[in-house]
């Protein structure tokens, strides 16, 4: 892989996960990041594990991009949607600003579409308005492991072409 290439399903369970049994990030993964490889979550049916994510985050290896790989087999779980995937990372300890950046600005930059992640004059002017809810929420990963979380992101509105959309 070359600088700027995107590796999706990067926090997957065994086999081929990015961490060792000893709780470290594999050297090849660290080397890939140093070469400029972009690490994307792509949470779908079989491609995301809390165990892997906990090891990666504990080692300071945050995902560059948080995305979902939602299709017919996982729309009813475990991935559900992008906001659920983002919420899982909040509950794993990532800061809200880092989670939002990894789902917006960084993917847009990786795709060379920076105008999609900006609200500056002259940009596309589209945004999802999110709410952060407190409560008790049950999250599940691709292996069936559960994580109790105290927060979740929900959709509160949409701005399209600079105007509030009323659907």
PLM features: residue spans?
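Active-site core of metal-dependent hydrolases
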Residues: 1-76
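His/Asp/Glu-enriched, well-ordered alpha-helical/loop segment
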Residues: 51-132
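Solvent-exposed alpha-helices and their adjacent loops that cap or buttress functional pockets
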Residues: 1, 31-33, 120-121, 148-152
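Short, solvent-exposed coil/turn elements at secondary-structure transition points
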Residues: 13, 45, 105, 133, ...
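A general structural signal for short secondary-structure boundary/capping elements
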Residues: 28-34, 87-91, 133-136
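C-terminal cap of metal-dependent C-N hydrolases
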Residues: 124-167
